[in-house]
Amino acid sequence: TPKKSGSLVLNCLNCGALYEYQYETDCHKKGQRMSELSRLKPDPIPTIHPIPEYAADAALTAIYERTKSGFGVPWMGVVAMAFAHYREFYNCLWQAMEPVVVTQAFADACQKLRFAAEKEAASLSPVAICSKLTKLGYDDREIEEIKNCNEVFSSGNMPYVLMATLARLLLEEHSWDGKGSAQTHDAPSITFKRPVLIELHHADPNTTALFTDIRQTLGLPFVNTDYRAFARWPSYFNPAWTDLRSIILREEYEHAVLRVHEAAVLLAGSLPNMSKITPQQLIGCATQDGQLSEVLSVVRLFQWLLPGLAVNVAVFRRQLV
């Protein structure tokens, strides 16, 4: 099978450095390269059945703790909890990922993916809102708390994006032949506490209406953890969402998200396959959980929405500069 190679240049907003990511992927057996994995929203949107941490049995709780520790995050993303409904599938996927998340290649991929999201967010020119927050009475300490909450997701979403992307690649029968370095490093420390979340039954009518608008604007039947965390500060989140909503409705927004999707596909495909998992192995485990088409539809849903979520959180971050 012929090889394809190229490079993706990502601009680091925070440090001004320029990163060049060299990738190499095999052609798919049907002629589709990993780098050409389309951005695909399933239709109809599948019903998800996330297993929250409090409802997990002992075995699943252990996997959840290893997931959070491996990713260096203080919360289980909805994506992982939805995948965990398909127990054999998630066990197989995590067993393949666990030795990868401690590699330098994985840490670098997360960093580069974040830089890609932040570059796209900057190109969308979000409105700065710190002066508005100050006029509302927010002091520097409170604004810093919002920034810290954002940092949880700005950094923590990236492992979940890569996990969903790898899951889709394998379920769609792409070989995982990444050439990234298998050199290991210490697992990332969890530096932030799990954010306080505003659940639907906590929300007053205004916040309930905001959550409804988020679902309708994004075309999703649920509200991601990130938005429920930011809703802790309603007078901040209302103007932040209003600006983001106007950005989402612009044509260039989808182009920006597509570029982050493409970066995720390239970066995920470059990771070293430490366990040598094959598409057939993950497909076999997913089949044990029921209909393969159902599992694939759920995986496609999250692999579609997470690049957009990464851009949205980066927009929120840019608003606070």
Question: What spans do the regions from the language model cover?
Answer:
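Cysteine-centered motifs
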Residues: 12-15, 27
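Hydrophobic alpha-helical segments
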Residues: 31-321
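Cys/His-rich microdomains that often coordinate metals
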Residues: 19
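Short beta-strand element of the conserved SAM-dependent methyltransferase core
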Residues: 10-12, 316
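Serine residues within intrinsically disordered or low-complexity segments
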Residues: 5-7
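Accessible peptide chain termini
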Residues: 1-3, 34
